[in-house]
Structure formats: C-alpha cells, structure tokens
Amino acid sequence: MSNTEVEELQPAPDFTLPAIGSDDVVKDGQVQLSALRGHTTVLYFYPKDDTPGCTAEACSFRDADHEMQKRGVVVLGVSADDIASHQKFAEKYGLSFPLLADTDTTISQLYGVWKEKNYAGKTYMGVNRETFLIDKDGIVRKVWPKVKAAEHAQEVLETIESLGL
C-alpha cells in the first residue's frame, strides 16, 4: 500500500485496528473508526511507545482527558507497536484512552503518516507524529502535520472549542 494524504474537510478513512483501553470505545479488542460517529474524535499517530516525545504527548492527552470526556471527545493513539507494548505503556503512565496497534502500518500509510525519516545519518521509514481532528459526521476538520508533543493536547482542546465541535 502506498501513502496517501488525508486532508481537511475530507471524510476520514474508516478502519478497524486491535486496541486496548476503554470498554466504551474498544469492542472485542478492536476499535472501528466509523463506530465512533456521533463523537468528535482525536486520532493521533505517534512513533513509538515509551520514548521521550511520545510519552510527553501521551501524558498531555492523559492530563486533558477529563476535559475531553466532558466535551464527548474520544482520543485514540495509534502506533506500530503491538498490544503488549501498548498495555505496558498505558499502565506505566496511567493512560485512560485507547491505544491502537497498527503493526503492519496499513493505517499509517492510509493516513499518510508513514514517511521517510532521518536520524543519526540514517534514513528509514517510520510513523510521523501527526494528529487528525474528526467531527461527529466523520469529516476531518483539522490536521496537525507537526506537533509539539508536551503542549499538543491543549492545542487540540483549543481547536475543538474554536470550531464548536
């Protein structure tokens, strides 16, 4: 599968992925995006469990979770890590929102976040830290292609408020 780009004001591509987390959202160990219609959804992609930037971002969403829930917003974190890794990550940091396992990167490619990266002089393919804000009708209302991990949840909340979602 090749990378596509999901843009604002387009329908969010549907998917089903294995997940851990809230029984309100995770059904039979999976999350199906289209089943969340009627809820504003924050779909955030991150490179790897329990790494500094990803931990800062996850903890920012954890800290904003009460405010998100008050607004009826569902937060979904997605990485290529497996369910066992997600379980350890969620337990270690007290994450209350679902973490989805895109182990074959199909959904990361579908959303255009599987990209060439450079680190320490090496080039490799990996998940880019990006977020998609999806409205109650399944339309992408905002895309964040660059994220400041520790401040991101607050930025998302402000956007939800400004868009009246």
What does each model-found stretch correspond to?
Residues 1-165:
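Chalcogenol-based redox active-site neighborhoods
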